[in-house]
Amino acid sequence: GTVGTADTLYNVRTTIPMDTQDYDPSKELYYVANQEVDAKRYFVEMHFKHAYSRLVLNIGVEDAYPATCSINSVALANDSLFRKAVIDITSGTVGIHPDDTEKQFRGGYNITKGLPYLLDSPDKKYQADLLMIPTKLLPDPFEPTKGLSVIVNVSGFPATVIIPIDDLSDFESGKKYVVSLKLRGIAIKSVTVTTTDWDEKILNEGVDYEPLPQS
């Protein structure tokens, strides 16, 4: 039968389209990671795994930040990011979307939910929560130790940070990644990255990074 999707190419039950999108429990997909068959007890035990990865992005201001600012836009960039792809739910293998003939569904993702967002207090933060298509991040061509770029428009001025690839090397299915940015003026002053098993583990021992403001 045809999978219930607008894509008419999917006539195979095991191949499902995926979209990077705002987190919604109803949009999650699962696949059988492994199964055990017990012939004596006549049962099959299946172990399901999240097909998607998940990214939570927090943006706030430093305690000493004196002014109000607006988060106008947020974008993620890496050559290996997927906006659309397909997954074989029998194996968990992610593949290129059949309509992605010119890489039009790869390379970046613009976050739109809740934007623009006014930051008028250190107690407030903008948060984006995304279902991400699993992928191995590629090193930045100019800074090979870094991978995922986060570009934030702060009150009309762009600022960017590139996360060290040793700390965030991929978006793995079934894992949640938390990236927290702190603003000082129109620069991203600090970044922390945490990964969880949807079981938190602090990356880089919680040390903030010094990102590159974008001129």
Which residues are covered by each model-predicted region?
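Short, ordered, surface-exposed loop/turn motifs in non-cytosolic proteins
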Residues: 64-106
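Low-complexity, acidic Ser/Thr/Pro-rich "mucin-like" tracts of secreted and single-pass surface proteins
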Residues: 110, 168-215
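Short Pro-Gly-centered beta-turn/loop motif in secreted/extracellular proteins
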Residues: 126-146
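Short, low-hydrophobicity acidic/polar segments
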Residues: 1-70, 114-126, 136, 172-173, ...
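Extended, solvent-exposed segments with strong compositional bias
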Residues: 98-130
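Edge beta-strands of extracellular beta-sandwich domains
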Residues: 159-167
